[in-house]
Amino acid sequence: AAQELGWIFLILTGISVVYGAFSACVQTDLKYINAYSSVSHCGLVLFAILMMNQTACTGAVLQMLSHGLMTALFFALIGMIYGRTHTRDVRELSGLMKIMPFLAVCYVIAGLANLGLSGFIAEMTIFTGSFQHPDTFHRVWTVIACSSIVITAVYILRLVGKILYGTCTNKHHLTLSDATWDERTAVIILIACVAALGMAPWWISGMIGDSVLPITDLFTI
């Protein structure tokens, strides 16, 4: 049934990947942006599983790990920013790099890590495995899903530029405090985990590959 009806779910997941990324581009609430980004990233997990091969499924597990860490980091930073500014509206935030440099730098790291460390590695593993599928239909949808990488770069870079740089337009934000030591410790731990997964993925991808192999072998029976 998975092989016969998988193409239906492939279309649905491919749409969710691209639609989620586009939806994140037009949101003005920081939490909504992160939520729609999660729709896109979680869609990639099911997209990879539907390819039914070891490489793609390894990428799916990496994506779940990466997404869990990245989402926790983003929501933690958003919560810390909201706790100080009392707003999540992108249009009301600007110039935070000068006001709360630690939180701002961590937000930049989180955004770039989503594009270039653990997030990128997981997605590339998924797309590499997807292109290994012998069916042209699956490869076409892989190309469509690949566009989400570019869209993700657009909304993350635009968001970073909007809320962190420029001139602060709200005078009440000028006196806000930066992160406390408790907050810094929590954020640094998450960043360290993201960096470890992104810069040395081989230490866990091998274990994941061995674990998913018996499952993917069932698809070929």
Question: Residue spans of the language-model regions?
Answer:
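Cytoplasmic/organellar membrane-interface segments at the starts of transmembrane helices
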Residues: 100-102, 156-221
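Hydrophobic transmembrane alpha-helices and their helix-loop junctions in integral membrane proteins
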Residues: 1-162
